[in-house]
C-alpha cells in the first residue's frame, strides 16, 4: 500500500511541475523478516541517508479519513523465562497435589505482572503515565482489536474508573505472552510438569529505557516465582522507542498537507509498534526531522493473513505527500 502511495505521489508531482527538493526514495522489506541489511548499511554508509527531512511511510491514520501523524513509537524487548521444579515429570496420581507444578509456577509468576484489573505492573517501574495526545476511545479499540463479545478491555472494571486505552497502549509498559511451552496438549500425560518456559514481549513508551525495564521484568519474575522453583529469566534483545515533535517545520508542513488532502484537521497519535529504523536514522543524522505517516489504518490488520488497504487512503496520503514535496523546498 505505501509503495503504491509513493508511486501515486510521484506521478501527481510530475503532472504538476515537479519539485526542487533533492529527493531520495528507499523501499526495503527485509526488516519484517528479521533481516539487518538496512541497519548495517546505515552504519557503513550513513552519507547515503543524509537529509533535512526523512518521511517514513510505515504507519497510518487513526481511522479511515482521519489524517494522522504518528509522534511516538514504543520501544521493546524480548524476554525468555524458564521455571524448573522437578528432576523429571512425576505421576500426578502418586505425587500430584504436593509436587510443585512448573507450569503453574510460571503461570503465577507471569500473572503477577498484571494487577487485578489486568493492567501491567512491574516492581520498581512506574506504570501509571498518562497520554496527552489524541484519545483512543474504548469503542474504537474494541473494533480495531476485534475483541469478542463480552470480553473486557484491561482496566475497564476498575471501580475508580476505566483506565483510558491510550494510556495503556502508548504511555505505559505492556507485556504480552507470545509463547508458552510445557507439555503440548496433543502429548498430555498424567504427570506433574517438571519444567515450563515462556517468551514475553515487552513494549515501553518512547523515552523510557527499554533495556532497564526489561531487566526489571526479569527481576520481578525471579522475585514472584513461587514455591522455591528454579527460575531463569533473561533479556534476549531490546530496542529503544522513538518520539518526534509535530511542531517542527517539516512535520508541521506535512500535517498541513494532510489536512488539505483530507479536508480535516490532522491529529497526533502514538503507535504501539516499534520501528528500529527511526532511531538508527536519528542517531546517524541527529539534525534530520523524521515524520511518520502512511496508509496502515487499524482496519488494515497489518501482519495478519488477510491484511488489506483502503484505496482512498492511498489516494489521500499520496496527495498530501505530493503537496509536501512541492512546498518543502
Language-model segments: residues:
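A short beta-alpha structural unit
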Residues: 202-205, 232-247
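Acidic/histidine-rich catalytic neighborhood of metal-dependent amide-processing enzymes
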Residues: 3-72
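Acidic-enriched catalytic cores of C-N bond-cleaving enzymes acting on peptides and small amides
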Residues: 71, 78, 92-180, 208-230
Amino acid at each position: 500500500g505505501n509503495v503504491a502511495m509513493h508511486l501515486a505521489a510521484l506521478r501527481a508531482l510530475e503532472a504538476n511541475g515537479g519539485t526542487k527538493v533533492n529527493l531520495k526514495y528507499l523501499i526495503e522489506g527485509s526488516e519484517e523478516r528479521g533481516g539487518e541489511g538496512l541497519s548495517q548499511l546505515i552504519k557503513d554508509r550513513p552519507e547515503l541517508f543524509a537529509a533535512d527531512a526523512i518521511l517514513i511511510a510505515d504507519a497510518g491514520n487513526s481511522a479511515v479519513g482521519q489524517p494522522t501523524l504518528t509522534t511516538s513509537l514504543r520501544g521493546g524487548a524480548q524476554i525468555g523465562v524458564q521455571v524448573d521444579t522437578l528432576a523429571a515429570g512425576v505421576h500426578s496420581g502418586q505425587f500430584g497435589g504436593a509436587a510443585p507444578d512448573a507450569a503453574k509456577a510460571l503461570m503465577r509468576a507471569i500473572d503477577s505482572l498484571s494487577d487485578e484489573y489486568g493492567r501491567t505492573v512491574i516492581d520498581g517501574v512506574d506504570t501509571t503515565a498518562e497520554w496527552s495526545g489524541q484519545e483512543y476511545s474504548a469503542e474504537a479499540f474494541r473494533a480495531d482489536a476485534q475483541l469478542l463479545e463480552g470480553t473486557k478491555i484491561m482496566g475497564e472494571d476498575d471501580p475508580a474508573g476505566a483506565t483510558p486505552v491510550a494510556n495503556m497502549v502508548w504511555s505505559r509498559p505492556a507485556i504480552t505472552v507470545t509463547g508458552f511451552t510445557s507439555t503440548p496438549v496433543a502429548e498430555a500425560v498424567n504427570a506433574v510438569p517438571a519444567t515450563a518456559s515462556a517468551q514475553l514481549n515487552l513494549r515501553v513508551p518512547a523515552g523510557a529505557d527499554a533495556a532497564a525495564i526489561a531487566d526489571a521484568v526479569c527481576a520481578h519474575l525471579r522475585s514472584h516465582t513461587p514455591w522455591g522453583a528454579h527460575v531463569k529469566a533473561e533479556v534476549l534483545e531490546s530496542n529503544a522507542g522513538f518520539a518526534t515533535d509535530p511542531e517542527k517545520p517539516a512535520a508541521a508542513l506535512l500535517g498541513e498537507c494532510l489536512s488539505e488532502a483530507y479536508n480535516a484537521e490532522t491529529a497526533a497519535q502514538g503507535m504501539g509498534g516499534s520501528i528500529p529504523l527511526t532511531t538508527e536514522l536519528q542517531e546517524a543524522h541527529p539534525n534530520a526531522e523524521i515524520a511518520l505517516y502512511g496508509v496502515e489504518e487499524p482496519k488494515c490488520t497489518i501482519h495478519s493473513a488477510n491484511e488489506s488497504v483502503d484505496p482512498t487512503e492511498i489516494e489521500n496520503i499520496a496527495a498530501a505527500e505530493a503537496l509536501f514535496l512541492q512546498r518543502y523546498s
